Amino acid sequence: MHQHICKKAIRGTSLILVLCTTSLYGHAQKRDSIAASSDSIHRIDEVVVSAKQMLGSKFEASNRTGSAYYVSPKEIAKLGYTDISRMLRAVPGVNIYEEDGFGLRPNISLRGTKAERSERISLMEDGILAAPAPYAAPAAYYFPNAARMHAIEVLKGSSQVQYGPFTTGGAVNMVSTPIPNRFTAGLRTSFGSYNTFNAYTYLGNDTKHLGYVVEYLRYQSKGFRRDEPDERTGFYRNDIVGKLRWHTSDEASTSQALELKLGFANEHSDETYVGLSEADFATRPYYRYRGAQMDEMRTKHFQSALTHYISFNNKLKITTSLYYNYFWRNWYKLSDISVGFHKGEKRSIETVLEDTEINAPYFDILTGAKDADGEALIVRANQRSYHSRGIQTKAEYKLSLGSSYLGLELGARYHADSEDRFQHDDSYSMHSGRMTLYRAGWGGDQSNRITAAHAFASYLLAKWSFSKLTLTAGLRLEDVEIIKRDYTTKDPRRTGHLRIDGDNHATELLPSFGINYKILKPLSIFAGIHQGFAPPSVAKYYRQKPEKSINLESGLRLNLGTLRMEAIGYYNDYSNMLGSDLAAAGGQGTLDQFTVGAATVKGFEFLASWQPLPRAWRVQLPLQLSYTYTDTKMKNEFYSAAWGEVFAGDELPYIYKHALNAQIGLEWKKLELNFTMRYNGDMRTIPGQGPMADAHKVPAHMIMDASVRYRLNNKVTFTANAINLANKAYLTSRHPSGVRAGHPFGLYGGVRITL
């Protein structure tokens, strides 16, 4: 096993060294043989920014051979959102359900992939994998703070062959604030309902050879959930990032840059898995039970990346990054309730809240209505640490072949990540609504294991354009080795004498092909096919196979004046779908994957934007509409701890079949108003088919938001945002445990200052 990993590391590192050596050799040749010309002079910041992004602009997104969406800086500023869930609502094909109301840990699905903890998307920041351990433990309990992002990119379909390891649904790239090309400083702050405060500030500059930017985000709230007495239910987050870049001058014939990025973030949130009963949701949807008074989440995150860029006459560009991320978290939260002192009398909060009448003695302890001695409430310290590190490189080459154009991109990445679980349970008694520690656990008495992964990935993408036709063909390799070392709860010192080892390995070649043909100047059609992949986990009793699928899409784009329209149909045929045992999805929280088997996901995506008024008018009325239809079906019968009994024909849970988002704006002189409406149809919370039972669905709901911006001058802009204008108490999920509500009405005012 270890020899295989070493060979993989050597193979990956060798390829990267070859590419780097080629770049240095090419640089020397260039200096010796080519004089600087005006055609080769271009700003290095353009090279650096493009290397970190998948798209870079809405224009690029609208000219792919597959589906793509670019959330621009202007779009982010217009709506004023700090919640990634709301930022992505307008993107067709994106399926999101809320959990905490602030977007702290979003649940994002692309084209019907599993939404829980965004574990089936390739999540990146500046082109580098950002999930804590995307191969070993893909559930993204860390998500980059959307409030400090410059732009957000979403790729789906055959256009995402460069990005992995999750290639069925798509990729999301969070683009952080770039180093400016001149001195720039800014402050963006807001304050409002529930003592919610958000402040973001940055400072940056660029000189002939040196550039930098430093940014800081503070995000905090008292929270909109309350209990009796008034317990802490809020959160705070800090996030600081700095970038330092050395680069050649603009006059250099060959542009180079070396950039160092460092970041630290932490969080303390009083979040819980405890929801509400149906009866309590109907009368007090923002209530929190007393049994959750000890629940809290603490996290620390450190990121670092050293990136080298080189561009030869703007024809050959090579980007190489060395990166390391560390994430630690301890989610201390209620897990089980016990009546008496015996294990047989212990029940999970999920079970208790499913039927509060049958479980009345347990429910009374949860609410504090009944005193209980001994080990009445079991609170679990879900302490885990994650390491993620690697080296990646890509080379982009552009070539003119007569009247046609050829673009080649070759990339490789060696990546290693790990999750270290060292969890324990504490027991509390309940007296007069207050919890008191009865018995403290010891580290590792609930879970004590390490899961590690080593992966080598590479790809080749070719793009050929001639006249009105564009063809792309790509091939991706994913080779991953996963190792699990369970030291068991009986060996907290990890001596290894009781250790249970397991491993798994998967190697897949993933082809893709796309076509774009411009029928008329404003109208084009496109289609694509690619193979989907997701790495497997280590199963106890059998060697689990990776997730595999064949995915097809076709669509058309119309760009006529100020009218932009896109319509796409897709069909994902899974030969082997995988599910995960997540506590966030109602499972036991082992993170072990289970085999769903054959399944299909098909859907339709529509996007339209229009400026109906002439540009010469002082008043503008921008309109945008997006719609997503998603139909899922599993073809096998099986049982899992997370989903229970599943039958052929059942639909996947937590996927909206219908989702609609509409935006209307009013722009007049220095004033800008925007209204957003989103509608989500009924959504299943467990696998099923036919009519949805009320106890197993999230009912359809429509939520309206609004934002106002007044530009006092070029440096100062006043902002106001309203969330959930109708103050609708709407249900967002029935997991992790019990019913929970979305964000109620909130009003926030602030100012943006730019120097």
Over which residues does each language-model region extend?
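Gram-negative outer-membrane beta-barrel transporters
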Residues: 401-402, 465, 571-573, 592-687, ...
